Amino acid sequence: MISSKTSNRICLCSPQQTARITGIVVSSRPAYLTGLGYPVSLRLSSAVSQSSSQHTRSFSSTRAAHLKDFFPVKETAYIRKTPPAWPHHGYTEEEMLAVVPQHRKPGSLSDWLAWKLVRLCRWGTDIATGIKPEQQVDKSNPTTAVAAQKPLTEAQWLVRFIFLESIAGVPGMVAGMLRHLESLRRLKRDNGWIETLLEESYNERMHLLTFMKMCEPGWFMKTMILGAQGVFFNAMFLSYLISPRITHRFVGYLEEEAVHTYTRCIREIEQGDLPKWSDPNFQIPDLAVTYWKMPEGKRTMRDLILYIRADEAVHRGVNHTLSNLNHKEDPNPFVSDYKCDADHQRPNPALKPTGFERSEVIG
């Protein structure tokens, strides 16, 4: 959390210790952020009162004057500011509230394979980020159920967000890179796919940078991210070479999980299960305000998660749709200009969680 008054560097070893430093009343029983028995340390930028700091002798703190930004902008003699390569188009509140978790049922063996691989990734992520059985949702409806016996803590959510977003930007970059090389080899246009895929990857990275403004993973989490990214990049690389269709379906299912994750977080904020994020004085990073062009009065943590969830809903619809197209010949319907026909206009991927069929967007 970014505060204009005070910033403390904290070595966070458990959700309970996070609760102590932020004034949240929790039990004193120790717990770990990872299911592997290792504590995940985070450096949090947070406004902390004097009364709280008097009871945190186990933490090493750095005064605000000595606390550096995690990724500061380097000052140059001439350049004042570097704007985003892909400015965000923004959403209306109605569009963001209309996003709901949905699941596209597998219609073929390849779809079923992609779905099961995503479920395997979800299982591994739950273990890696320390999600306990009582914190898991109904396994019979894993993509749509958002209620659990016990909510996650703010620290658990941040660990989960950072881990997920650190690899979520990989698929779009891999697919865009391979399509770029294919276009060069075939001496043919790509028909607009590359731009959308790279923009998706860029958008996911902005999600990560936003959460990194709130906390920094410790060495163990960084090691996990390094390993996961290496495995995931190579897996996506080989997968896209073999079958772009299956890969886009896999990413579509992965984005279903992302929409589900952020929907559950919004629900827990609204129910008051995350008191620090429900605090009206909680300040989201300026990076987020600038990127999403968030208006005054709509800059709470809930609003931030609404914007990010809407992004994931767009990625969900885009990838499910691209999986239905001929990846060698069909143009990208989301950047194409359509003929003057009221019945066929540029589709909005957020409005079709299961993706558009080829006949709906190509003809």
Swiss-Prot record:
GO terms for cellular component: mitochondrial inner membrane. Residues 1-66 form a transit peptide. The gene is AOX1. Gene3D superfamilies: Alternative oxidase. This is Alternative oxidase, mitochondrial. It is an enzyme of class 1 (oxidoreductase). Its EC number is 1.-.-.-. Catalyzes cyanide-resistant oxygen consumption. May increase respiration when the cytochrome respiratory pathway is restricted, or in response to low temperatures. Fe cation 1 binds at residues 165, 204, 207, 312.
